[in-house]
Amino acid sequence: AASPHRAPVICAISGSGGCGKSTIVATMAHTSSLLGLRAAVLDLDLMFGNLYDLLGVDAPRDMAALIEPSAAGVLAEPDIVAASMRVAPGVTLWGPVAAPEQAELMARPVELLLDVLRRESDVVFIDTSVFWGDAVAAAVAASDRCLVVGDAAVSSATSASRVIELASRVGVPRTRMSAVFNRFGARGADEDVAMRFEIACALSSKIRIADGGQDL
């Protein structure tokens, strides 16, 4: 029998905020849609995420609407659709929650939603918060590729090595992680700084994203 379709899950993590995870996730989702793929996007910075803003959503929907139906152990299509935001042809977004205090209740809903999205989408992109609750930890553990994002900030290399250890502890092998140095070429983000970040990460897979300048 043919194995069931399971879309790859690509998760962006970092040990410090402001390094560009959300922008990278939004860009990957947009690019995937241009390639004709159905991209599902989860903003698991559940308390204060702003992916909906980056993706141009005027009226964000509350992902906490999935808490009650998830108690049954399965999410029905109408519930999933009601909590979603159709950003563009091929890009659909879920998250964050409207009331930050509900973030800790999202582990089970996220697990159930991710299971459905892996069957119904071509690719799943996940943005995360610096603080990991159960929902983030479970999503990272389920990822097929984990992007460890950093930049030229002073603490970026040290915090990246710590978040790699955390991802390892939830079951992600280092072979599924990539070191992503963002804004390469910007002021203070030269070859030496990028190499320092990559050495601290000690991952065989390395990616550098060039700085786009002030206009981007």
What are these regions (language model features)?
Residues A72-F131:
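Cytosolic-facing regulatory segments adjacent to core modules
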Residues A1-I10, A71-V74, R169-G171, T175-M177, ...:
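Acidic-aromatic/histidine active-site loop/patch
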Residues V116-S121, W132-V154:
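Inter-motif core of Ras-like GTPase G domains
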Residues S32-T92:
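Phosphate-binding loop that captures ATP/GTP phosphates
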Residues R6-L55, L117:
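Walker A/P-loop phosphate-binding motif and the immediately C-terminal alpha-helix
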Residues S33, A167-T175, E198-A202:
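Arginine/glycine-rich "motif VI" loop of SF2 helicases in the C-terminal RecA-like domain
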Residues R183-F184, R196-L216:
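Beta-strand-loop-alpha "switch" segments that mediate conformational coupling across diverse proteins
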Residues V123, R145, L203-I207:
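Well-ordered beta-strand positions
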